[in-house]
């Protein structure tokens, strides 16, 4: 497992929620653009980068804090982006794509059902399915929500 988890985002609400589920440190890169500078020393600090936003700037910032021969797992799908191949090659990064964790879905459901993983802190809103339009509008606004749940009971 990871010995230290650092999460970045542009909203304080999201960062507060990831602290609840175990992040050791959080950085709001919108209000503290130099918040990762301490991790840049000695060619990088982290062994693994999981980029979940699909944002080109987020991926590029990760290049600066990832150790040589580090692993980048790209989960976010933001369309076409440009990456500095010179850095990718010079630091010998291993860049991997991961699409929605298809293989892990059944395991994730099992862990939640057994109470071994608590996702409740990640759910910012829970609405009855009859309010699906409001739920989708909330889900589309990252400044208002993190994860929106529809209930059917």
Predicted segment positions?
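Well-formed, non-transmembrane alpha-helical positions, independent of function
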Residues: 17, 61-64, 86-87, 138
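C-terminal hydrophobic helical "lid"/dimerization subdomain
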Residues: 12, 20, 60, 102, ...
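Rossmann-fold NAD(P)-binding glycine/threonine-rich loop
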Residues: 76-92, 103-110
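Conserved beta-strand positions in the Rossmann-like core of class I SAM-dependent methyltransferases
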Residues: 5-6, 73, 96
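Short strand-turn motif at the edge of the Rossmann-like AdoMet-binding core
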Residues: 75-79, 98-100, 123, 127
């Amino acid at each position: 497992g990871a010995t230290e988890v650092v999460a970045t985002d542009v909203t304080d609400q999201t960062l507060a929620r990831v602290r609840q589920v175990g992040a050791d440190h959080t950085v709001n890169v919108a209000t503290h653009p130099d918040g990762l500078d301490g991790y840049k020393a000695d060619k990088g600090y982290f062994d693994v980068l999981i980029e979940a936003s699909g944002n080109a700037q987020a991926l590029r910032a990760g290049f600066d804090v990832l150790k040589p021969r580090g692993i980048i797992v790209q989960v976010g799908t933001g369309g076409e982006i440009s990456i500095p191949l010179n850095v990718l090659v010079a630091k010998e990064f291993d860049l991997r794509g991961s699409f929605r964790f298809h293989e892990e879905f059944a395991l994730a459901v099992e862990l939640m059902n057994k109470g071994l993983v608590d996702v409740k802190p990640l759910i910012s809103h829970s609405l009855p399915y009859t309010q699906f339009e409001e739920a989708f509008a909330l889900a589309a606004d990252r400044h208002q929500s993190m994860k929106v749940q529809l209930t059917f009971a």
